[in-house]
């Protein structure tokens, strides 16, 4: 019902707010489908069978995306409204059922519920301006590390994509700025914090496994306690149920069990809180393609009141970033990006500061200028091995490689907190061939935590569960995948493809040690054009060969983890 309402509102806005921009249209953008049959033989269970799949997709454009802005000179008000492309989409998938949705797409965020938004609102006084839209002090959002296989992959989990300044929660206010286009800009922001009360919407009974991470006020022993927030019934405070960790805000559950979790929702919002923060950001472009940005924020907290941890009183956030592109010639270039983040947390109880973040991240790409980036296809490494196995995939919300950048990329993260780099020193190297060699697509990955103490920890006897746990940590990984188009004649093309992914992990304490290795393999060959609109595929997938070994107290244990995988043939008709 809500989507239908937004749909009709958006249609009305086409005629009223955006008279000419963007243009309304009614046309079929995509009408496609496919049907496939696969015969597979599981080499582990020694069983065979058929699998039928059908997919259909209809995309009907109602309106192109666009924007409308006021214009002026000297003293004037700038307002820019942006509308996303509006599209009806209907899908049919035997595995997922049938769906019908009105959707929009903005930037690289995938589906977005915003149809019309204010992009810019500024009062201009020649080169001076006052911005009046909301926003936090998350400086550095436009400094992306140029990783070849996962550029802009996720805007939430930013471990290998970008590193913005800390979120302070002060997002209401204005920005006073001065800008000389293509030279520099400086902005002073004054913002306040709104307070929104929460209330329990419902209570869920959740089954937790042993070792689950628990936070305060997250799970309770009884349903009434979850509603009232009874601290005595909070399992976080029960030493018989949970164990402490290195992080005082997180504990682990000793044994599996079912507990009550309150699901909260926003209640009332108060904007007049007397809580303020200040920020300053500057950006300069001294030469073409070189950009330097520096920003800092300081939290004043509630004026006239005692310092508060909840309000982040006296906290300090700093960001600095540099990115550049240098063209060697028309074929090759380098593209470095370096960022630095610092966050100093003021502890009210001790009246001292504690450094929470002190980290520099750096990315460097050696790019192939004549090859275009690819935002339509995933890398073969992702296609073959999936999100859960790849070093750089760290969140379940990611949906594959967002954009593939032709070239070689190197990434490193350096945590300057005391002793942090002894256990945390991640580096990553990625490669995408682009169109460097005609008909060849190649992808490579190396990732590792090079901290000298990263492998230190308690060693236990090897078992299937221990082996799996070590591999899932992805301590070190190397992967390679490639495909090549072989044109038999004008009609028929054979595309062989192969991928291999090695994952290693280890842990040791004194003479006790354990380690695990896994090599995953996938092969396939597509035959296109033999029959019109049809692709025939022979494949071997989901195969892995692993071994885990441990030596604890002089006793050696080991496990073999071998999955022979599935071989099969597939025929797919598509239009």
UniProtKB/Swiss-Prot annotation:
Compartments, as annotated in UniProt: Cell outer membrane
UniProt keyword terms in alphabetical order: Cell outer membrane, Membrane, Signal
Membrane topology: Peripheral membrane protein
Native organism: Treponema maltophilum
Chief localisation class: membrane
Keyword check for Signal: yes
Protein name: Major outer membrane protein MspA
Highest taxon, organism lineage: Bacteria
Function: Major component of the outer membrane sheath.
């Amino acid at each position: 019902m809500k989507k239908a309402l937004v749909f009709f509102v958006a249609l009305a806005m086409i005629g009223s707010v955006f008279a000419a921009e963007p243009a309304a249209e009614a046309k079929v953008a995509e009408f496609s489908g496919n049907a496939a049959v696969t015969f597979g033989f599981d080499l582990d269970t020694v069983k065979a069978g058929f699998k039928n799949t059908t997919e259909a997709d209809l995309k009907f454009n109602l309106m192109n995306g666009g924007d409308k802005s006021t214009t002026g000179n000297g003293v004037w008000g700038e307002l820019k409204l942006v509308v996303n492309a509006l599209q009806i989409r209907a899908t049919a998938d035997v595995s997922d059922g049938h769906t019908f949705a009105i959707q929009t797409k903005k930037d690289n965020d995938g589906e977005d519920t915003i149809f019309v938004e204010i992009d810019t609102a500024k009062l201009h006084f020649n080169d001076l301006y006052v911005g009046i839209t909301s926003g936090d002090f998350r400086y550095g959002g436009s400094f992306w590390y140029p990783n070849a296989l996962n550029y802009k992959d996720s805007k939430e989990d930013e471990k290998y994509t970008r590193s913005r300044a800390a979120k302070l929660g002060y997002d209401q206010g204005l920005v006073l700025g001065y800008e000389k286009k293509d030279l520099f800009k400086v902005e002073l922001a004054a913002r306040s914090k709104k307070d929104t009360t929460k209330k329990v919407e419902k209570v869920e009974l959740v089954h937790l496994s042993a070792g689950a991470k628990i936070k305060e006020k997250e799970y309770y022993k009884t349903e009434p306690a979850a509603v009232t927030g009874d601290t005595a019934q909070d399992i976080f405070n029960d030493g018989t149920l949970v164990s402490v960790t290195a992080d005082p805000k997180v504990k682990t559950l000793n044994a599996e069990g079912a507990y009550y979790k309150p699901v909260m929702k926003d209640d009332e919002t108060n904007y007049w809180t007397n809580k303020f923060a200040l920020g300053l950001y500057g950006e300069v472009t001294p030469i073409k393609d070189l950009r330097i940005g520096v920003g800092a924020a300081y939290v004043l907290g509630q004026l006239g009141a005692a310092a508060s941890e909840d309000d982040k009183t006296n906290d300090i956030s700093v960001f600095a970033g540099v990115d550049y592109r240098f063209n060697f010639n028309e074929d090759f270039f380098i593209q470095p990006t370096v960022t630095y983040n610092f966050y100093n947390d003021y502890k009210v109880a001790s009246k001292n500061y504690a450094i929470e973040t002190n980290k520099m991240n750096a990315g460097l790409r050696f790019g192939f200028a004549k090859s275009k980036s690819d935002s339509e296809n995933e890398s073969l490494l992702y296609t073959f091995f999936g999100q859960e196995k790849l070093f750089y995939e760290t969140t379940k919300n990611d949906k594959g490689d967002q954009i593939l950048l032709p070239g070689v990329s190197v990434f490193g993260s350096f945590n300057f907190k005391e002793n942090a780099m002894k256990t945390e020193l991640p580096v990553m190297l990625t490669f995408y061939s682009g169109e460097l060699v005609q008909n060849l697509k190649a992808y490579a990955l190396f990732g590792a935590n090079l901290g000298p103490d990263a492998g230190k920890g308690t060693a236990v006897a090897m078992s299937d569960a221990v082996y799996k746990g070590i591999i899932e940590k992805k301590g070190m990984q190397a992967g390679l995948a490639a495909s090549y188009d072989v044109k038999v004649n004008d009609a028929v093309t054979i595309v062989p493809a192969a991928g291999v992914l090695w994952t290693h992990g280890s842990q040791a304490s004194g003479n006790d040690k354990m380690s695990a290795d896994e090599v995953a393999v996938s092969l396939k060959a597509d035959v296109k054009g033999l029959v019109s609109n049809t692709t025939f595929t022979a494949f071997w997938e989901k195969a892995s060969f692993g071994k885990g070994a441990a030596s604890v107290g002089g006793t050696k244990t080991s496990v073999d983890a071998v999955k022979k995988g599935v071989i099969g043939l597939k025929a797919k008709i598509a239009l």
